[in-house]
Amino acid sequence: MAKKETKGTQTKTAGAVKAGNGNYYFRIAELEKVAAGTGYSTSHGGVVEGDRMLVGWIHKPRGTGSRMHSHANEQFNYVVQGTLRCEIDGVKSLAPAGTLIYVPANAPHTMVATPDEDVIFMAIKDLSQGIIGKAVDGTMSGPHYDPGFK
């Protein structure tokens, strides 16, 4: 369904597929997996970028996830499978399948798959930057692992 990337169709997220110019339908779960949090998260999955928005079909292995980070783009995550343990701007919650999560632009946040099963979620962001943010502590020293999951 998705065409190969061609000249003039650069994306902000390395490895993402560019939508438009006849490229309108995507089997997002089958796209090449790209890192969706290099240096601070275990998240990875297929990503499609339009002109102003991106959508990712993102996977987090159980017991792993992101360290506290932020990014200039606001974000919605819809949890499809599993449960995320979240903290957004100081507010903690569990987000099971069926939950829509909102992350304001520049809000510090972390999301970790609970130990019982892997998480799949759909990420939707504006394209003020790509899918990857920056860790709040200023380091890109790796993702979060719950004890026993590294």
Residue ranges and their predicted role:
Residues 1-52, 136-150:
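A short, N-terminal "cap"/entry segment at the start of jelly-roll beta-barrel domains
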Residues 39-41, 56-70:
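Conserved short histidine dyad/triad with adjacent acidic residue
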Residues 73-74, 78-84:
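Glycine- and acidic-residue-biased ligand/ion/polar-headgroup-sensing regions
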